[in-house]
Amino acid sequence: MFMINILMLIIPILLAVAFLTLVERKVLGYMQLRKGPNVVGPYGLLQPIADAIKLFIKEPLRPATSSASMFILAPIMALGLALTMWIPLPMPYPLINMNLGVLFMLAMSSLAVYSILWSGWASNSKYALIGALRAVAQTISYEVTLAIILLSVLLMSGSFTLSTLIITQEQMWLILPAWPLAMMWFISTLAETNRAPFDLTEGESELVSGFNVEYAAGPFALFFMAEYANIIMMNIFTAILFLGTSHNPHMPELYTINFTIKSLLLTMSFLWIRASYPRFRYDQLMHLLWKNFLPLTLALCMWHVSLPILTSGIPPQT
């Protein structure tokens, strides 16, 4: 039964990833005043299936100088970790209801750095290594602010269990009292998932394609799927944290519809941002984090810690 549950989680994720690639190409196309993919199937709807078949039947080439085991393990690990991070997400019921779901998410996102590092190192190419080192520095840096923002939000929720956030936000979305945190969280998720304008790891103009430059066919597709699964997962996480949907046990469909719309709008904003903004310079990216976001998030975290202590002495207003 548990295996069926796992499959019921994984298959929709992979389908969502496939069609997100199509949506992205369509959105970017229309924003650049062109059509986007429209040949394979009606309105180009079968394009992702054609892409998947093409990628998986190609011969997976490997550079002669690469480290074989690491080179093959890195994309498998990337997709595995990307799918593992979905386990504690309440939609409205998680696959496994963990007591420390948030810590699990942070641990898994930290591990995702290793797959990028391995792929860059195992490729034995200078471009791949530079891309991987950039990706690792960027991901580790932005994880610091993500963790502090999460801590501040959880102080308002009072639990490390993600399901508690649904109950916390029955009266009011947390984006209203914590909008500076939400803004910094959203920008940090962009950097964490290596999306434009923070896509320095795969800067086509300078690094060819970044850490996955030596990958082709199936292994490349695994990296691609991992990246898009992480984008959807991060947007779902944002919707859970800041745009909590109230759950009525008698009408669970309403929760699903509401929650899906919020997640899709956030994902759409990722695509819109990609179409609108130029890429950051690497030093600007780090400056934004260490000089701007980190002091701000630390100050807000101290505020969120001290606020309950300050207000605990106020008697109830009758």
UniProtKB/Swiss-Prot annotation:
**Which purpose does this protein serve, as stated in its record?**
Core subunit of the mitochondrial membrane respiratory chain NADH dehydrogenase (Complex I) which catalyzes electron transfer from NADH through the respiratory chain, using ubiquinone as an electron acceptor. Essential for the catalytic activity and assembly of complex I.
Q: What are the transmembrane regions?
A: 2-22, 70-90, 100-120, 147-167, 172-192, 222-242, 253-273, 294-314
Reaction(s) the record says it catalyses: a ubiquinone + NADH + 5 H(+)(in) = a ubiquinol + NAD(+) + 4 H(+)(out)
Q: How does it assemble?
A: Core subunit of respiratory chain NADH dehydrogenase (Complex I) which is composed of 45 different subunits.
Q: Say where the protein is mainly found.
A: mitochondrion
Is the keyword Translocase in the record?
Answer: yes
Chain segments annotated as coiled-coil in the UniProt record = none
EC numbers: 7.1.1.2
Q: Which GO terms describe its cellular component?
A: mitochondrial inner membrane
Key words of the record: Electron transport, Membrane, Mitochondrion, Mitochondrion inner membrane, NAD, Respiratory chain, Translocase, Transmembrane, Transmembrane helix, Transport, Ubiquinone
Keyword hit for Cell wall biogenesis/degradation: no
Report the GO molecular function annotations: NADH dehydrogenase (ubiquinone) activity
Name-wise, this protein is NADH-ubiquinone oxidoreductase chain 1
PANTHER family assigned: NADH DEHYDROGENASE SUBUNIT 1 (PTHR11432), NADH-UBIQUINONE OXIDOREDUCTASE CHAIN 1 (PTHR11432:SF3)
The membrane-topology field of this record reads: Multi-pass membrane protein
Under InterPro entries, the record lists: NADH_UbQ_OxRdtase_su1/FPO, NADH_UbQ_OxRdtase_su1_CS
Family designation:
Belongs to the complex I subunit 1 family.
What is the top-level taxon of the source organism?
Eukaryota
Instruction: Name its GO BP terms in alphabetical order.
Output: mitochondrial electron transport, NADH to ubiquinone; mitochondrial respiratory chain complex I assembly
